């Protein structure tokens, strides 16, 4: 990647968060909503498709949750190839992610984010010179899964323990796997309370604010978790 392209795409990365609030949609579609990277795998691949009508310049990279940091500054133990590619309409591109073998935590999963930034071609006609060129950014989770972790990721979400602390709900995750909760509904004394989506870290807990929270102990919670394949699974539990 030449220096000009590097600077241009870096600038677009910093601005893309603002673009995402506009009424438009991305043309690049990623196959899947998450990536699982088993430690024993040499690499993993991600497929992308351009479903728009124009060729697009696409940059791919990983971040560690700091989504506004210049990709050139992040020093992560992965290589993404190709980092920049052109994808024509109705065509696809496969991106390869390779772990560099730099040490990562071995007793639990590590979470990273796979980013795709698509840049449309510049308008050529005079009437379009002042048109706003939108760059779209898509992020999906990538879980690095060490070999030999205890338990089964397929059942981890169903084993969450729920407690109340003040006006917050505490989701306790005793497994070594991240749990992605799409939504949840608390039912207490016949009243239903909707809870926003959250990601519960492994061997830890997540504090979830609950507006106007009554006493929740003894109430029930129904929550939807996202599995390795992007599918959803419904679970029920009692709040202790």
Mark where each language-model region is.
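Intrinsically disordered, low-complexity Pro/Gly/Ser/Thr-rich segments with frequent PxxP/GP/PP motifs
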Residues: 70-103, 190-216
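Short, basic/aromatic beta-hairpin or loop at an interaction surface
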Residues: 64-74, 181-185
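Bacterial N-terminal signal peptides that target proteins for export
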Residues: 1-11
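N-terminal signal peptide c-region/cleavage motif recognized by signal peptidases
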Residues: 21-23
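Beta-sheet-dominated interaction scaffolds and their linkers
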Residues: 25-49, 151-164
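Terminal connector regions
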Residues: 100-149, 155, 215-240
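Asparagine-centered strand-capping/turn motif at beta-strand->loop junctions
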Residues: 48-52, 169-175
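Short, hydrophobic/aromatic beta-strand segments
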Residues: 54-62, 172, 179-184, 235
